[in-house]
Amino acid sequence: MLQRILVALLALGLSPLAMAAPSQVRITHEDGRYVLRVDGQPFRIKGAGMAGAGPAALAARGGNSFRTWDTGTDVADVRAMLDEAQRHGLKIAMGIAVGNERHGFDYDDDAAVAAQLSRIREEVNLYKDHPAVLMWVVGNELNLHYSNPKVWNAVGAITDMIHREDPNHPVMTTLAGFDKRLIDLLKARAPSLDLIGIQLYGDIGALPEKLSTSGWTGPYVVTEWGPTGHWESPLTSWKAPVEDDATRKAQLLQQRYEQVIAADTTQGLGSYVFLWGNKQERTPTWYGLFLPGGESTPAVDAMEYVWTGAWPSNRATSVAPLHLDGRVATESVTLQAGKPYAAKIAAQDADGDALEYRWTMLHETTATSIGGDREDVPPAVKIALHGDGKGGLRFDAPKRPGAYRLFVEVLDGQGHAAYANLPFRVEDR
């Protein structure tokens, strides 16, 4: 009989895990502090934005939750994701795609707004009863490059609908920065939101002040944070952003978590670091905690430490800033076309692992996208790169003038890697 029931469930696209009771998630106010509770137990979010590195690795490193940005179009894939999260003891902040004005959505179009609400109702009802669901995230950075405040009325209507359809899970929206004017709009137009998601990068240290001056006294989750953003980093003289090396990023993540995120147990419910995987955004390494090849970086080690209080038994290599022609990126390195040059990266591995150095050169990106919109990886430069296997490199500068970027990955053979890159410009002799 049990076997026949399992077969019937699978035929309906439902797994046994999905048939378990939905999680009961509440935000309570206790002794002057907000507390997120899952099935009655306190739940401090130790999470990441998920982008391909996998729930198993997140759980192994001490994480307990991940967030998504939408529910996608393949129901079977979403249910498989929920099931996998449940197997690893993880909860998911389920992202719901909501039209952004910067992408052309018109909140004066009542028919489009109604159709969006109907579509979201269907999505919520598909997944609301899965035990891995933690909460709903209505849209992402809807305040980025927008002008029509009706978007917040739509968020309010979506929130009200979700509360009716799914009383078991809180609802929030995420904000790309915030101030009193924005918080006042949310209070007036979407008052039923249970909490807000805050997304800050290099300026996350200002979060306590922003909370105070904006008038937001309710609970929040830091739904995106991480390295210093490309828009707030130093620039070369030709406006190429300077990216921190992997070791510096790990140091900043640990510092920002300990000083800002972990420090607020009054309003803060935890965070989702960006990004558990990799993506191209100005460079292929700027935001991902993993390299495209799947290797974990020092940032992953840092997150394991702040989540668990212990470092992993084998850690990623440590690197110093990359030098080209004896200079670092902030010195706006300019080379002469066709001339020979040398680059150097200093690396140390605390475990004594043998190191492999991988060098690549790309054209500098011309992308100007915002808000994480899709970018293509710039084309590689067809040029001979002569590494010495010890962190040194020799090459002849490209013959064509323009903007380029030199990359190096330092792999330890244990599934970990550090990296650095340096933008440079080539001029005619």
Explain the meaning of each model-derived region.
Residues 28-30, 37-193, 206, 216, ...:
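Active-site mouth of glycoside hydrolases
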Residues 420-427:
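C-terminal edge beta-strand
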Residues 30, 38, 45, 212-374, ...:
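Substrate-binding clefts and catalytic carboxylate motifs of secreted carbohydrate-active enzymes
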Residues 396-401, 414:
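Short, surface-exposed loop/turn segments at beta-strand-coil junctions that are enriched for proline
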Residues 177-231, 235-236:
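Aromatic- and acid-rich polysaccharide-binding/catalytic face
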Residues 7-16:
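Bacterial N-terminal signal peptides
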